[in-house]
Amino acid sequence: MSEIKKVATRDSYGNALVELGKEHDDLIVLDADLAGATKTGMFKKAFPERHWDIGIAEANMTGIAAGVAACGKVPFMSSFAMFAAGRAYEQVRNAIGYPHLNVKIGATHAGISVGEDGATHQCLEDIGLMREIPGMVVINPADDVEARAAVKAAYEHVGPVYLRFGRLAVPVFNDEATYKFEIGKGIVLKEGTDVTIFATGLCVNETIEAEKMLAADGINAEIINIHTIKPLDRELVVKSALKTGKVVTVEEHSVIGGLGSAVCDVLCEEAPTKVLKIGINDVFGESGPALELIKKYGLDAEGIYKKVKAFVK
């Protein structure tokens, strides 16, 4: 049996930027002294004149990106999620969101999988923050194939886009030959009748593995990959919830404001359903090896399996 390929989606981001850079001269990449970590260094090596390192000044980088977009170019500004969505939030809101400028935000090192960097760098609130900005598209890809497709789709979309990437190498489960990405459209990975599990980001693969354990217990779960949290695929969410009658959401993010909240916003209006939100429960993260933290917070396959089983039974 061949070894499962693993790639960090931040690497996918860097590779996708290089490929886009070959095709589009209007692509400008900005970074805040983190080109090695965000992987925009790949773009810098290929197109040094179109890679601008602003230094540790994320608010300034955001304003510059807004200006670049106003001049007709397509900027991708890059930093850790904690800094892109956290430190520079006011500028993202007012300089990019309010005038609805065509800026793409590549936010890496999101969630607890940042690992040893600890709570100060483990951004668990970014999806919620970005969802609140009118007109902002929010994408959280699950693997290398999806992440590279998402970067391309973000370039083609006219308007602000927040792309969430991780530090941890995760399994590549999508088939590049057949995979199709569309902003705002969820993907049914497996149909089921007993419960729907909506997952996003690195939690998608863990949910796929959890489903195998659930199946062994006679629980027929429907698994849906929600790569775009805003705009959410309302039609698919409602259709699946009505079909199974029970809903679970799984995310490497606070249960407040993220995928779970987005799904509940839709269901309370269109299809009231019992929902279990699996994520980070209103606490800060902590320092530790990424895989150990994922297990501790119940976001690994076994943790998801146990919570869903108890919920369904």
Q: Model-flagged regions — what are they?
A:
Residues M1-R164, A169, ...:
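Thiamine diphosphate
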